[in-house]
């Protein structure tokens, strides 16, 4: 069969093309080694099934140095990015080097490939969700779930690089920043992942699902995080530096910096193990990594057998959360300033030895719960008692509670028996020192997450010093050290007209009852950076009802209004979130609310937004504009609303579990 390869004719040019309707010059299909002309090539892609470029064949080497693929127009919001830049569709001995890819849902996707090399590619600034958690309170909308990927469900969360059914790969010197996910791998084996930087991402640095026999070494995987606001909440929302799920076994993870992630490591046996009690993500070796400064767990490893040796684990909620771990080694690690350094429920035959604990609240906590779900397959198939620990040769300094152990049997202390420890994995030749250098930023106070993810500290930024709704509002001036000047201020006065980074300014709203200001500073290089806030108080009259006796779905609010009002209150906003009662005096579950209010908006274009779990309906001036009247997890609905006076009505109900209701008006 004759092979046809189409080449770009426009050297170094900038053109905007569609992957579905492209001129003949664009290489839609590449089947041989070649060099693409340098330059920025703007090629849209509707989805992962219509890639900008497809690579198909074997023994192909593409050096894309100087080539940039851009999938979306400049100024497009990151959650609107779509499509796939490069698809590697089968074959053997394929190399992609030095590409720069931005503005897509997925940068590079390789499937059914043997002996793949991805080296020196920059897949930064691709797709990421808009986040709705705020300084003071999280939103459940931002939670993710990576528990199933048998049908590529992970693709809904985007990726810089996505590998499926890849056997034998060298992934090195790639960069993914300021997207949602860095490197995502499923159903693959025998990979070497080293000298990469997957940092400042809003979800995962590296995600692994049914990945075996692979090495992850010498990588910088820092600030892969969401769901954290320093001093307010630490939830993580299933973000992590490294995620290993569903029978990911026999891997080596060594000499990586995995700090400031939602979790550092998030390892889980998988749903098949939850149902059957068999298998797990087992026999992985974690050696010499830095798993520090996680809002939740430095290491979360559950329902599995693994070795954790010589790691640094500092300033996490839990240093190790090891629920249902068995036959695992936790040896020679340095724990410091964790709330609970090691916490294991229902663990068995684990060894905790030769670790140091410094200034932790609790060093070792072991326990079993009094009851377990009788319908859960895992305890039906396995003995899940907490038992059979060897705890020896650990050093403690400044620890408040050395051990806290309940409902746990057969603990051996200070034994002299020999413990067989795996050898240190050999470093890869030319492997980088991935660790954060002395004097650089360390600590959870340096995690700042805005609506697009973690701040990377490379550019100036204004951020609240405390609550974001304070008046006057104190703003920190963050970023590289330099001078700044006040560029503009509308709707507010500013405490200073010039200053230095780092620093602080105070902003006082002058707009009256409605807070509507924007402040712009200019740094020493001429870059502008801004902070704005809009808040229109609404005169809400809120009435709550107990609907526990009303079992029909959805609730009939005409009938609900005939019930006794259990809480009658007034507020200037609707903003509820709780896993229990959303307000004092209400039951935890089965409630309904009717709210009526009036708002006066200034001139301009606005959006009325709701975040709801469960049902919500909204009327504006008597017209139904949002109608999501069913049981659902937290979801966002938006409709436009104009300036002026409006009468608003909100109906809401919540059945069981977590409840969330936010009704707000935001300026365009």
Predicted regions located by residue number:
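Acidic/polar low-complexity surface segments
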Residues: 69-87, 117-164, 170-173, 182-186, ...
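Detector for repetitive beta-architecture
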Residues: 27, 32-33, 38-40, 52, ...
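Extracellular/secretory pathway-exposed regions associated with glycan biology
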Residues: 532-607, 611-668
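A short, compositionally biased micro-patch
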Residues: 29, 55-56, 89, 111, ...
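Long, low-hydrophobicity ectodomains and other hydrophilic envelope-associated domains
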Residues: 429-540, 544-547, 553-556
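Extracellular beta-strand-rich solenoid/capping regions of secreted or surface-exposed proteins
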Residues: 27-30, 42-61, 71-95, 103-115, ...
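Bacterial N-terminal signal peptides
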Residues: 5-14
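Boundary at the C-terminal end of the N-terminal hydrophobic targeting segment
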Residues: 17-23
């Amino acid at each position: 069969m004759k092979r046809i390869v189409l080449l770009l004719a426009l050297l170094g040019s900038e053109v905007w093309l569609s992957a579905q309707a492209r001129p003949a010059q664009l290489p839609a299909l590449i089947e041989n080694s070649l060099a693409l002309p340098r330059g920025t090539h703007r090629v849209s892609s509707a989805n992962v099934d219509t890639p900008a470029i497809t690579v198909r064949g074997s023994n192909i080497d593409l050096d894309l140095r100087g080539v940039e693929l851009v999938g979306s127009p400049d100024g497009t919001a990151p959650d609107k990015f779509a499509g796939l830049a490069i698809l590697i569709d089968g074959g053997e001995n394929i190399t992609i080097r030095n590409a720069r890819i931005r503005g897509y849902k997925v940068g590079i996707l390789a499937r059914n490939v043997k002996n793949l090399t991805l080296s020196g590619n920059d897949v930064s600034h691709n797709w990421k969700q808009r986040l709705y958690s705020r300084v003071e309170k999280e939103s459940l909308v931002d939670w993710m779930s990576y528990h199933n990927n048998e049908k590529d469900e992970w693709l809904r969360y985007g990726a810089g690089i996505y590998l499926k059914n890849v056997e034998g790969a060298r992934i090195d010197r790639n960069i993914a920043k300021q997207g949602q996910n860095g490197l995502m791998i499923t159903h693959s084996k025998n990979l070497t992942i080293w000298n990469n930087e997957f940092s400042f991402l809003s979800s995962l640095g590296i995600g692994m699902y049914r990945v075996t026999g692979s090495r992850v070494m010498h990588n910088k995987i820092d600030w892969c995080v969401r769901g954290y606001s320093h001093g307010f909440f630490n939830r993580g929302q299933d973000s992590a530096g490294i995620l290993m799920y569903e029978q990911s076994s026999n891997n080596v993870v060594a000499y990586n910096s995995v700090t400031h992630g939602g979790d550092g490591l998030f390892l889980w046996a998988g749903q098949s193990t939850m149902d059957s009690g068999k298998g797990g993500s087992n026999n992985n070796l974690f050696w010499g990594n830095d798993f520090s400064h996680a809002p939740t767990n430095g290491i979360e490893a559950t329902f599995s057998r693994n070795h954790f040796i010589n790691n640094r684990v500092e300033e996490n909620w839990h240093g190790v959360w090891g629920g249902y771990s068995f036959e695992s080694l936790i040896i020679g690690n340095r724990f410091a300033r964790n709330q609970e350094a090691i916490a294991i429920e229902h663990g068995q035959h684990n060894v905790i030895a030769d670790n140091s604990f410094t200034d932790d609240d609790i060093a070792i906590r072991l326990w079993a719960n009094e009851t377990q779900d009788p319908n859960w397959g895992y305890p039906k198939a396995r003995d899940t008692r907490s038992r059979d620990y060897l705890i020896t040769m650990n050093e403690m300094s400044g620890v408040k509670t050395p051990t806290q152990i309940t409902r746990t049997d057969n603990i051996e202390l200070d034994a002299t028996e020999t413990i067989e420890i795996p050898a240190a994995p050999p470093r890869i030749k030319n492997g980088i020192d991935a660790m954060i250098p002395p004097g650089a930023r360390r600590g959870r106070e340096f995690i700042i997450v805005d609506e697009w993810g973690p701040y990377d500290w490379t550019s100036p930024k204004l951020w609240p010093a405390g609550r974001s709704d304070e008046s006057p509002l104190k703003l920190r001036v963050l970023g590289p050290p330099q001078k700044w000047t006040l560029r503009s201020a509308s709707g507010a006065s500013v405490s200073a007209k010039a200053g230095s980074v780092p620093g602080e300014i105070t902003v006082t709203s002058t707009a009256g009852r409605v807070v509507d200001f924007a402040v712009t500073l200019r740094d020493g290089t001429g870059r502008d950076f801004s902070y704005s806030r809009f808040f229109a108080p609404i005169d809400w009259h809120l009435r709550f009802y107990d609907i526990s006796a009303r079992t029909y779905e959805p609730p009939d609010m005409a009938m609900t209004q005939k019930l006794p009002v259990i809480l009658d209150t007034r507020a200037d906003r609707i903003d509820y979130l709780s896993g229990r009662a959303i307000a004092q005096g209400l039951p935890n579950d089965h409630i309904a609310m009717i709210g009526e209010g009036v708002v006066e908006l200034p001139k301009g274009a606005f959006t009325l937004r709701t975040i709801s779990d469960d049902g919500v309906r909204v009327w504006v001036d008597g017209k139904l504009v949002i109608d999501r009247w069913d049981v659902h997890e937290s979801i966002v609905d938006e409709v436009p609303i104009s300036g002026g006076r409006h009468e608003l009505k909100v109906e809401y109900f919540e059945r069981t579990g977590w409840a969330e209701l936010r009704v707000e008006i935001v300026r365009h």
